[in-house]
Regions:
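Short, charge-rich binding segments
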Residues: 65-66, 87-89
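Hydrophobic alpha-helical segments in the ANL/AMP-binding
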Residues: 59, 84-87
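Class I SAM-dependent methyltransferase "Motif I" SAM/SAH-binding loop
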Residues: 76-80
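S-adenosylmethionine
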Residues: 81-85, 92-96, 100-208
Length: 208
């Protein structure tokens, strides 16, 4: 099964209908990722069906029906998950992809151009030099201490969003309380063939 067929099939089985333009953009990114991955080891997930579910739909599903922020920042963007997918799901939002590893940042810069996102998405290497946006996203793994440092720079009405699992909810609530934040209702979803997932959310402001 091709990557495009895999995305369509997994989306349908997961109960979502992806626009053809979004599927095409994902396919262009996957092709570019495959080329770079031969020499730069950007991801271990290279098989089309697995990548469609574990990378692309896992990033897109919880964002598709969520009102877009004006701005977002993806911390530890890696190969573009979830930041590049967030840019596709939120076509009016301006985004910053933060990736300190030079080779990965070079890939992201090329991918942003290949997907014609240059006008509203930029790549940065140092989080301390970036103004954090309305939504701070992270699918990367960070120690709680590192997340606490990042939270200290989030605007009063900003929101921290972390990809996780339902069993993470209780520890998440305890963790964000140490930042002076409060947890927000998680966004639950399930990609066909994967375990239940959710977006863990927190803010220090009045957002709901």
């Amino acid at each position: 099964m091709t990557f495009v067929e895999s995305v369509r099939s997994a989306a349908r089985r997961s109960g979502v209908d992806l626009p053809e333009a979004m599927i095409d953009a994902c396919a262009r990114h996957f092709a570019l990722l495959g080329t770079w991955n031969r020499t730069h080891n950007l991801t271990r997930i290279v098989e089309p069906e697995e990548a469609a579910r574990a990378h692309y739909l896992d990033c897109l599903m919880p964002l598709l029906d969520w009102p877009a922020p004006a701005t977002f920042v993806d911390i530890g963007s890696g190969a573009g998950f979830p930041g590049l997918l967030a840019a596709l799901a939120w076509p009016q939002a301006r985004g910053t992809l933060i990736e300190p590893a030079r080779k990965r940042a070079s890939f992201l810069t090329l991918a942003v151009h290949a997907l014609a996102l240059d006008a509203r998405v930029r790549v940065a290497g140092i989080v301390e030099q970036v103004e954090l946006g309305d939504r701070v996203l992270s699918r990367a793994t960070f120690p709680p201490g590192e997340r606490a440092k990042l939270a200290g720079r989030v605007a009063d009405e900003g929101e921290v969003v972390v990809w996780g699992h339902p069993h993470d909810l209780s520890t998440w609530e305890a963790e964000v309380a140490t930042w002076g934040f409060r947890s927000l209702p998680a966004r639950h979803y399930r990609v066909e063939g994967l375990e239940p997932r959710c977006l863990l959310r927190a803010t220090r402001g009045t957002a709901t």
